[in-house]
Amino acid sequence: MNNVPSTSRENSRNPSESSSSIQDLLINVEANDLSSVVNEDVSITMSAPPSPATPRKIDFSAEIETPKSTGIRRRLTLKDSIGSDLENDPESTPAIRKPSRISYDERLTVICDSQTSSPLQTPSPSQERDSAPFADVFQPKGFFSFFWEELTRGYSLHNDHARFSEKRRKVYAFLRIPLELEQFLTYGLLQCIDAFFYLFTFLPLRFLMSIFGALLRIKRWTSAETCDFLKVVIIVAASMLIREIDSSFLYHQVRSQGVIKLYIFYNMLEVADRLFSSLGQDIFDALLWTANSEKRFSVGYFIRTCGHLIVAILYATLHSFLVILQATTLNVAFNSHNQTVLAIMMSNNFVELKGSVFKKFAKANLFQMACSDVRERFHIFALLFVVMIRNMTAVNWNIDSFTEMIPDIIMVVGCEYFVDWLKHAFITKFNEINAEVYKDFTITIAFDVIRSRDQSAFSDYSDQVSRRMGFIPIPLSIMIIRVLSQTFTLDNWGSCIIFGIGWLLVFAVKICNGVVMLGQACHHVKRFRDIQARAEFELFRKRMVEKKSKSAPNSPRMSLIDFTDVLHQPAAGKGFTVSDMLSQWEELQPSLLSSEIRRSTDRETAVSHLTARSDERTPRRAVSMAHIPRRDRSEPPPAPSMDQDPQLDTEDPVVTENNTNSNSEQASPVKKKTTAAPVTSSASTNTNATSSDELADVTAYKMPEQGVQRIE
C-alpha cells in the first residue's frame, strides 16, 4: 500500500523539476569533460621520465581522439539518451553513464633518441621573456675556440634568396643604363643636327622660293613663308651686329684673367646660356604668332610685328655674344701652358654630378634632364668645332697642331660622356626607376618627328626640337657664321668653290640624317604600337569583358609621355608606358604564342564580316593607336528602342536577322538581345574602315538603352 502512493507521487512530479535535473546533468557532464581534459594535459606535462625498459607503444594507425571530438560525441549521446527518456517510461530507462575512454591515471610517454634527455615541458611566459634570441650564439669564447670557429663557421646566401636576387637585378640595371642612355642621346643628337643644318640648307632655299613666288605671283603667301622670312631676317641682322665685335680683343681680355676668375666666369656663362635658352623660344613664338595672327596691312599690325622683331634680334645678338664668350674661354683653356684651366673647367661636370644625384627625381624630371644633356652635348661639340677652327687658322692649318689638340678634345668629350653615365645611373638607382624608361623617352621624341611631317603640323620641326629639348639653333648658327666669315674670305674663285663643296656636303648630310631619323622614328612608333596591341589584348581583355555596367570605364592604354618643353613640364598622363609593359614581359610572354593564332583568326573573321556588311558600322570598344595627330571621331549608328522591335520584326525580318547575327558575333562586354535598326544610306556613307597601318587612340564607349554614345 505504501508503494502505490509513492509511485503516483513520483509520476505526478512537477515538470520544472525534471527540466532542472536535466540541466544539472548537462552541467555535470561538461564539467567532467573539462576535468578529464585538464587531467590529461597535466599528466602529459608533469609525468615523470618513463622507464626505458617498458616504453609505451603508440599505435599510429588508430584514429586520433581529440578533446573536442570527444566532447561533441558525449553531447550527442547525452541528447539521444535524454530524448529516449522523455518518450519512454522513465523507470525503465537505466541510469545515464558518462561514456569516457580516458582514464585519470593514464600517462603519455614520449620516446626520445637520447636516453638522458629531459621530458617535454612547456616554458612559462616568464622564461620566454628572460631567454634572449640566439642565446647559444652570444656566449663568451676563448682564444682557441674563437680561432677555430672563425675557420670553420659556414653560411649560405640561399637563406635570403629574394634579397640577393633583387640586388643582382639592380646591378645589372645599373650597368645597362649607359647603353639605354646612349641610344636616347644619340637619337636626340640626330634631331639637333637636323634642326641645326636646316638653317643652312633648306631655310635659304625656302626663303628664295617664297620671295620669287611672291614676286612672280606664282602662289599665295602663307604663314609658313612668313615664319621663314622672319627667321632669315633675324639671322642676317644679328650676324651683322656680331661682326662689330672684335674677337681678338675678347681673347686677350679673357686670357689676362686668373685661373679662379676664368672658372667662375665660365660657370656664369653656362648658367646664363641655360636662362637665355629657356627665354629665347618664347620670344620667337611670340614674334611668329604676332606676325600671323593680327590683321595684316594695318598700322597696329606693323607696329606690333616690328616691336617683336626688334626684341628677337636683340635677344639673338646677346645670346650669340654669350656663346662666343664661351668659345673664347674654352679656347684660352686649350692654349694655356699647363692646362690647369682646362682641368678646372672639366671638374665643373663633377660638381653638376654632386648637385643632381642626391635629389628626388620622377620620370618627368628625368626626361627633362635627359633632353638637357642632349642639348649640352651638341653645344659642347659646336664649341669644340669653333676652338679647332680658331687654332688651325692661327697655325696656318698645320696638321701637327691638330694632332696635339686631339688628346684634349678626347678628354673633354670623354669627361662629358662619363659624367652623364654616372649621373643617370645613380639617379635611376636611388629613385627606383627602371632602365626601360629611356625607351619611353625615345618614343616621345620619335613621335615629334612623325608629327612634324604631317600636313596639319602646327610648327616647324626645328621649333619643336627647341621646345622639347631647349635647343635653339639660331644663336649657334650666328656664331658659326661669324667664325667662318673670319676664317674664310670669298675674294677668289678657289674660296667660292671650297664654299660650294662644303655647302653641298652639309646638304647631303642633312638629307641622309633626315632619312635615317625618320626611319628610326617609324620603327620606334611601330614597335610601340605592337607592344600596345599585345598588352591591351592579353592583359586587359578579361577585365573589359567582365565590366557589365552601363557606363564602361575608359580602356587602359599605353600613353606616350607628352611634355611641352624642357623647362615647363606638365604632369605625365595616366596609362601604361613601354617601360611598365617590358617590366611585366615575363607574365605576358607565355600567352603570346597561343594568342597569335587566335588573333590571326579573329582578324580574318573581322575582315570578312566588314566586307560583307559594308553598309553597317559597329561600335568599337578599344582600337589600338591608329592615327597619331587626330582621334577617331566617327560614331556608330544609334540602336532602336525596345518599343520599336515588334514593328521592325514584321516589316523587315531579313535585315533584322542579319543584324542580330552580326551583333552577336562582335566582342562586346554586354550582350543584349536587341535587334538593330536597318542602316540607312547616310550611315553607310560615313563608314570608313581604319587601316591597320595607321595609328589611333583608344576609345571607350558606354552602352545606354537608347543608343551608343562615346565617353569623352
From Swiss-Prot:
Biased composition (Low complexity): 1-21, 675-692
Region (Disordered): 1-22, 44-66, 596-712
Pfam family, one: DUF747
Predominant subcellular localization, coarse grouping: membrane
Keyword Coiled coil on entry: no
Protein family per UniProt: Belongs to the TAPT1 family.
Descriptive protein name: Protein TAPT1 homolog
